[in-house]
Amino acid sequence: MNILIKNADIITCNASDDVLQGAFLGIKDGYIDFIDTKEDALKDFKADRIIDAKGKLVMPGLVNAHTHSGMTILRNFANDLALEDWLFGNVLPVEEKLTPEDIYWGTLLGIAEMIKSGTTTFADMYLHMEEVARAVSETGIRANLCRSPLKDSDKSVEDAVRCFEYFKKWDNSFNGRIKVYIEVHSVYLFDEPSLRMSAEVAKEINTGIHIHVQETLKECEDSNKKYGMSPAEICCKTGIFDVPVIAAHCVHLSDGDMGIIRDKGVNVIHNPTSNLKLGSGIAKVDDMLKNGINVALGTDGAASNNNLNMFEEMHLAALIHKGVHMDPTLIGASCALKMATVNGAKALGFGGEIGEISKGMKADLILIDMDKTHLCPVNDPVSAVVYSAQSSDVDTVIIDGNIVMENRELKTIDEEKVKFNVKEIAKRVLR
């Protein structure tokens, strides 16, 4: 379907940070065909749908670069705990009760929440990833999914085969909406041979790795006791960092760790809400950016956030570093927005395809209703998005050239059915 968006104010997130007013944007066969402020650009374009964006702001869809979407089932459960108590004492025991079908419904709820809050792409690491892929395929969202070749140490060969099969089935499927990486949960759950094997598998099938890195001080202390080196150092030693990497958190990096991550081209995912809620700390994002490290944003799971709202992550990322360092110039609005769009696209392996509004890019966009009291007057659109906008301001979402939400109505998800099923699942597993 060819879509024309007219009367559009557009934040492009391109290299020049262009912001256009009263522009026309054409979508053809899932790609951005043109962007122009002159009506002459329309003469050769035949639109199947015309969207009048007067009073709305068009911008790239947000990229949630680290989450566990099926954990919506555990939302508002086991709060106010340190990571180790939260994970080992509460979350893991409940997760043992979750069935593949449970994960399917939990993921659908997460996707519904993400689309309604302007997220068009996400990176997911969780259980029963076949069901996560099914939910992604049905809903039209874009995703980087990962699967481990070592789910069960007693069945490593069988799990490795299933990992290869998963990659073959889902990688680059659905018009390229799905990418598949290798899951390496963390250094504290994977021993050195497992880390090496995972790196070898990623190299063999030419893909990347999604891993948690140095989220807490305890993780760093335990790694130093066990290996005599930091998690970043052991990842470097075992080959984990020799492939494209999505490294979630990276809260406690020494200068040496940061040098490794910079030199290896590791993508860091900043999860400010989750890190604060679990008392993990605050990542040195400004130092990372000054070192040329690509930093994107993520929500983490709804069990530790407790939502999947990327507007909150942008807002918080733009505030906490100013306060901690007593420097209001750190992580400006434009920087926070780039972290949630183009940087996220690069981190997830979609760089050059999404994350900005430019001719030839895939049409992943959102329209924000700017006619709201809390946004008036707009003055600076980028600042308005980062500092004033709410997720509920997202009116329309387009992914891969398809309208998946319009006038806040989801087109690919039965929202009420999903909510009903997740409530029933939560009653069963949390009792």
From Swiss-Prot:
Cofactor comment in the record? Answer: Binds 1 zinc ion per subunit.
Task: Please provide, alphabetically and separated by semicolons, the GO molecular function terms listed in this UniProt record.
Answer: 5'-methylthioadenosine deaminase activity; metal ion binding; S-adenosylhomocysteine deaminase activity
The entry marks the following residues as binding Zn(2+), namely: 66, 68, 212, 300
Stored Gene3D superfamilies = Metal-dependent hydrolases (3.20.20.140), Urease, subunit C, domain 1 (2.30.40.10)
Q: Which domain of life is it from?
A: Bacteria
Cofactors that this protein relies on: Zn(2+)
Which of this chain's residues are annotated to bind substrate? 95, 147, 185, 215, 300
Q: Which family does it belong to?
A: Belongs to the metallo-dependent hydrolases superfamily. MTA/SAH deaminase family.
Know the name of this protein? 5-methylthioadenosine/S-adenosylhomocysteine deaminase
In the record, what lineage is assigned to the organism producing the protein? Bacteria, Bacillati, Bacillota, Clostridia, Eubacteriales
